[in-house]
Amino acid sequence: MKDPIDLYMNTLVPMVVEQTSRGERAYDIYSRMLKERIIFLSGPVHDGMSSLICAQLLFLEAENPSKEIAMYINSPGGVVTSGLSIYDTMQYIRPKVSTLVIGQAASMGSLLLTAGEKGMRFSLPNSRVMVHQPSGGYQGQATDIMIHARETEKLKRRLNEIYVRHTGQDLETVEAALERDNFMSAEDAKAWGLIDEILESRNRPDDTAK
Protein backbone atom coordinates (compact mmCIF):
# COMPACT_ATOMS: atom_id res chain seq x y z
CA MET A 1 0.00 0.00 0.00
CA LYS A 2 1.40 3.42 -0.95
CA ASP A 3 2.06 6.04 1.70
CA PRO A 4 -0.80 8.57 1.30
CA ILE A 5 1.57 11.45 2.11
CA ASP A 6 4.02 10.36 -0.58
CA LEU A 7 1.14 9.98 -3.04
CA TYR A 8 -0.07 13.48 -2.21
CA MET A 9 3.39 15.04 -2.50
CA ASN A 10 4.13 13.31 -5.79
CA THR A 11 0.86 14.11 -7.55
CA LEU A 12 -0.47 17.38 -6.12
CA VAL A 13 2.64 19.58 -5.94
CA PRO A 14 1.82 22.84 -7.78
CA MET A 15 3.90 23.86 -10.78
CA VAL A 16 5.08 27.43 -11.38
CA VAL A 17 5.63 28.65 -14.95
CA GLU A 18 8.10 31.47 -15.59
CA GLN A 19 8.91 33.37 -18.75
CA THR A 20 12.61 33.30 -19.66
CA SER A 21 14.63 34.48 -22.65
CA ARG A 22 14.33 30.94 -23.98
CA GLY A 23 10.61 30.68 -23.47
CA GLU A 24 8.56 29.22 -20.67
CA ARG A 25 10.11 27.17 -17.90
CA ALA A 26 8.15 25.15 -15.34
CA TYR A 27 9.27 24.43 -11.78
CA ASP A 28 7.60 22.51 -9.01
CA ILE A 29 6.86 24.95 -6.19
CA TYR A 30 9.65 23.63 -3.92
CA SER A 31 12.29 23.97 -6.63
CA ARG A 32 11.12 27.52 -7.23
CA MET A 33 11.46 28.27 -3.52
CA LEU A 34 14.95 26.76 -3.58
CA LYS A 35 15.88 29.42 -6.13
CA GLU A 36 15.02 31.94 -3.40
CA ARG A 37 17.23 29.98 -0.95
CA ILE A 38 14.22 28.62 0.95
CA ILE A 39 14.23 24.98 2.08
CA PHE A 40 11.11 23.20 3.34
CA LEU A 41 11.62 20.53 5.99
CA SER A 42 8.15 18.99 6.11
CA GLY A 43 7.01 15.66 7.53
CA PRO A 44 8.82 12.88 9.38
CA VAL A 45 12.62 13.00 9.48
CA HIS A 46 14.15 9.92 7.82
CA ASP A 47 17.18 9.02 5.70
CA GLY A 48 15.51 9.98 2.41
CA MET A 49 14.49 13.41 3.67
CA SER A 50 17.90 13.89 5.29
CA SER A 51 19.71 13.27 2.01
CA LEU A 52 17.50 15.78 0.19
CA ILE A 53 17.85 18.49 2.84
CA CYS A 54 21.63 18.05 3.11
CA ALA A 55 21.97 18.14 -0.68
CA GLN A 56 19.98 21.39 -0.85
CA LEU A 57 22.10 22.98 1.89
CA LEU A 58 25.33 22.02 0.13
CA PHE A 59 24.02 23.20 -3.24
CA LEU A 60 23.05 26.60 -1.86
CA GLU A 61 26.45 26.92 -0.18
CA ALA A 62 28.19 26.20 -3.49
CA GLU A 63 25.96 28.73 -5.25
CA ASN A 64 26.67 31.53 -2.75
CA PRO A 65 28.69 30.79 0.43
CA SER A 66 27.87 34.13 2.06
CA LYS A 67 24.11 34.45 1.49
CA GLU A 68 21.61 33.37 4.14
CA ILE A 69 19.52 30.20 3.78
CA ALA A 70 15.97 30.03 5.20
CA MET A 71 14.62 26.71 6.48
CA TYR A 72 10.88 26.35 7.12
CA ILE A 73 10.12 23.49 9.52
CA ASN A 74 6.86 21.57 10.00
CA SER A 75 7.85 18.18 11.35
CA PRO A 76 6.81 15.66 14.03
CA GLY A 77 10.43 14.47 14.29
CA GLY A 78 11.75 11.07 13.35
CA VAL A 79 15.01 9.14 13.13
CA VAL A 80 17.70 10.63 15.38
CA THR A 81 20.67 9.82 13.14
CA SER A 82 18.89 11.26 10.09
CA GLY A 83 18.19 14.45 11.99
CA LEU A 84 21.76 14.69 13.24
CA SER A 85 23.07 14.52 9.68
CA ILE A 86 20.94 17.58 8.86
CA TYR A 87 22.09 19.29 12.06
CA ASP A 88 25.77 18.64 11.32
CA THR A 89 25.39 19.95 7.77
CA MET A 90 23.71 23.13 9.04
CA GLN A 91 26.67 23.74 11.34
CA TYR A 92 29.23 22.74 8.70
CA ILE A 93 28.29 25.00 5.81
CA ARG A 94 29.36 28.63 5.57
CA PRO A 95 26.01 30.38 4.99
CA LYS A 96 23.94 31.29 8.03
CA VAL A 97 20.79 29.18 8.29
CA SER A 98 17.63 30.87 9.53
CA THR A 99 14.90 28.56 10.90
CA LEU A 100 11.15 29.16 11.15
CA VAL A 101 8.59 26.74 12.55
CA ILE A 102 5.22 26.68 10.79
CA GLY A 103 2.81 24.22 12.39
CA GLN A 104 4.98 22.09 14.62
CA ALA A 105 8.58 21.28 15.42
CA ALA A 106 8.52 18.18 17.59
CA SER A 107 11.29 15.87 18.76
CA MET A 108 14.12 16.06 16.19
CA GLY A 109 12.23 18.90 14.52
CA SER A 110 12.71 21.03 17.64
CA LEU A 111 16.44 20.32 17.66
CA LEU A 112 16.76 21.45 14.04
CA LEU A 113 14.69 24.54 14.84
CA THR A 114 17.02 25.64 17.64
CA ALA A 115 20.09 24.76 15.52
CA GLY A 116 19.52 27.82 13.35
CA GLU A 117 21.79 30.85 13.53
CA LYS A 118 21.49 32.67 16.87
CA GLY A 119 19.12 35.60 16.46
CA MET A 120 17.58 34.03 13.34
CA ARG A 121 15.35 31.34 14.86
CA PHE A 122 11.67 32.15 14.53
CA SER A 123 8.16 30.82 15.10
CA LEU A 124 4.74 31.79 13.84
CA PRO A 125 2.39 32.58 16.75
CA ASN A 126 0.31 29.38 16.71
CA SER A 127 3.12 26.91 16.08
CA ARG A 128 3.86 24.22 18.65
CA VAL A 129 7.20 22.87 19.78
CA MET A 130 7.81 19.58 21.60
CA VAL A 131 11.01 18.27 23.16
CA HIS A 132 11.65 14.85 24.66
CA GLN A 133 14.33 12.21 25.07
CA PRO A 134 15.03 9.69 22.28
CA SER A 135 13.07 6.46 22.24
CA GLY A 136 13.39 3.11 20.52
CA GLY A 137 12.36 -0.52 20.63
CA TYR A 138 14.67 -3.47 20.15
CA GLN A 139 14.35 -7.23 19.99
CA GLY A 140 16.78 -10.09 19.85
CA GLN A 141 19.30 -11.51 22.27
CA ALA A 142 19.55 -9.92 25.70
CA THR A 143 23.14 -8.83 25.05
CA ASP A 144 22.14 -7.03 21.84
CA ILE A 145 19.27 -5.30 23.62
CA MET A 146 21.70 -4.04 26.26
CA ILE A 147 24.06 -2.76 23.54
CA HIS A 148 21.23 -0.81 21.90
CA ALA A 149 20.12 0.55 25.28
CA ARG A 150 23.63 1.88 25.95
CA GLU A 151 23.72 3.47 22.49
CA THR A 152 20.36 5.16 23.14
CA GLU A 153 21.73 6.50 26.43
CA LYS A 154 24.76 7.94 24.59
CA LEU A 155 22.47 9.58 22.02
CA LYS A 156 20.37 11.02 24.84
CA ARG A 157 23.44 12.65 26.39
CA ARG A 158 24.58 13.99 23.03
CA LEU A 159 21.17 15.50 22.23
CA ASN A 160 21.04 17.10 25.68
CA GLU A 161 24.44 18.70 25.03
CA ILE A 162 23.18 20.12 21.73
CA TYR A 163 20.14 21.68 23.42
CA VAL A 164 22.43 23.15 26.09
CA ARG A 165 24.64 24.67 23.40
CA HIS A 166 21.83 26.34 21.48
CA THR A 167 19.35 27.31 24.23
CA GLY A 168 21.70 28.53 26.94
CA GLN A 169 19.97 26.31 29.51
CA ASP A 170 22.10 24.30 31.93
CA LEU A 171 22.34 20.53 31.57
CA GLU A 172 20.14 19.77 34.58
CA THR A 173 17.33 21.96 33.23
CA VAL A 174 17.53 20.33 29.80
CA GLU A 175 17.53 16.81 31.25
CA ALA A 176 14.44 17.59 33.34
CA ALA A 177 12.61 19.21 30.40
CA LEU A 178 13.30 16.27 28.07
CA GLU A 179 12.40 13.52 30.54
CA ARG A 180 8.87 13.28 29.10
CA ASP A 181 7.02 14.79 26.12
CA ASN A 182 7.20 18.53 26.81
CA PHE A 183 4.91 20.66 24.64
CA MET A 184 5.52 24.40 24.32
CA SER A 185 3.73 27.33 22.78
CA ALA A 186 5.72 29.81 20.73
CA GLU A 187 5.99 32.00 23.83
CA ASP A 188 7.25 29.08 25.92
CA ALA A 189 9.80 28.14 23.25
CA LYS A 190 11.12 31.70 23.19
CA ALA A 191 11.39 31.85 26.98
CA TRP A 192 13.25 28.52 26.98
CA GLY A 193 15.73 29.70 24.34
CA LEU A 194 14.65 27.42 21.50
CA ILE A 195 13.75 30.39 19.30
CA ASP A 196 14.61 34.08 19.29
CA GLU A 197 11.48 35.80 18.00
CA ILE A 198 7.79 35.20 17.26
CA LEU A 199 6.70 36.57 13.88
CA GLU A 200 3.06 37.55 13.37
CA SER A 201 3.32 39.12 9.92
CA ARG A 202 5.79 40.44 7.39
CA ASN A 203 6.43 44.15 7.11
CA ARG A 204 3.67 45.55 4.94
CA PRO A 205 3.69 48.70 2.81
CA ASP A 206 1.84 51.65 4.30
CA ASP A 207 -1.77 51.67 3.10
CA THR A 208 -1.46 55.39 2.46
CA ALA A 209 1.33 54.76 -0.05
CA LYS A 210 -1.00 53.23 -2.61
From Swiss-Prot:
Its principal location? cytoplasm
Task: Enumerate the NCBIfam families for this protein.
Answer: PRK00277.1, PRK12553.1
Please give one Gene Ontology molecular function term for this protein: ATPase binding
Kindly state the subunit structure of this protein: Fourteen ClpP subunits assemble into 2 heptameric rings which stack back to back to give a disk-like structure with a central cavity, resembling the structure of eukaryotic proteasomes.
- What is the protein named? ATP-dependent Clp protease proteolytic subunit
The biological process GO terms on file are: protein quality control for misfolded or incompletely synthesized proteins
Which organism is this entry from? Cereibacter sphaeroides (strain ATCC 17023 / DSM 158 / JCM 6121 / CCUG 31486 / LMG 2827 / NBRC 12203 / NCIMB 8253 / ATH 2.4.1.)
Tell me the enzyme class. hydrolase
User: Mind telling me which PANTHER family this protein's record contains?
Assistant: ATP-DEPENDENT CLP PROTEASE PROTEOLYTIC SUBUNIT
Alphabetically list the UniProt keywords. Cytoplasm, Hydrolase, Protease, Serine protease
State the family named in the UniProt similarity comment for this chain.
Answer: Belongs to the peptidase S14 family.
